[in-house]
Design a protein with these regions (language model features):
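Helix N-cap/capping motif at the beta->alpha junctions
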Residues: 35-42, 65
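Short hydrophobic helical patches associated with two-component signaling proteins
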Residues: 16-21
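CheY-like receiver
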Residues: 45, 51-126
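Charged phosphotransfer/docking patches of two-component systems
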Residues: 11-15, 91
């Protein structure tokens, strides 16, 4: 199971990310749980150590996503962080807090899919297809082991 947090003050953007996660889970048969936080303070008050991946907006009311990432890193240096922003100028700052990547708003599913797959690879949760080679009278066949 993958645990993901979305830290985003814009409800429409958060709902979009949640729908993308649901779609990704169905397409890839990934069991996951996602929690949405509307601001950085609420996120930091939660047990951030339970999350594998965090999608965090940079521009948040009160504490910025960058500040929240710095605080989060103190207790959870291994969490995978992907920033969400509408300003590319913040991208370079994200690497100061070891962000894996960033997604530009408005978020589109292909970009989400690519970033989420990258994050899951680091989590070790990508599906690695195992094949079986079967020799029969008709020849040699390669089959997905899950189908046998």
């Amino acid at each position: 199971m993958i645990y993901t947090a979305i830290v985003e003050d814009n409800k429409r953007d958060a709902e979009r990310l949640l729908s993308f996660q649901e779609r990704y889970g169905k397409e890839h048969k990934l069991v996951q749980q996602c929690q949405w936080f509307s601001d950085a303070e609420k996120f930091l008050k939660s047990d951030t150590r339970r999350f594998d991946i965090v999608f965090m907006d940079i521009e948040l009311p009160g504490m910025s996503g960058m500040e929240a990432a710095e605080k989060m890193r103190q207790s959870n240096p291994d969490i995978i962080l992907i920033f969400i922003t509408n300003l590319a100028q913040y991208v370079m700052k994200g690497y100061q807090v070891d962000a894996l990547d960033y997604v530009l708003k408005p978020i589109q599913y292909p970009a989400f899919d690519l970033k989420f797959q990258k994050a899951l690879t680091l989590c070790g949760q990508t599906k690695k297809t195992e094949y079986m080679v079967i020799s029969a009278n008709e020849g040699v066949f390669r089959m997905d082991a899950a189908d046998v």
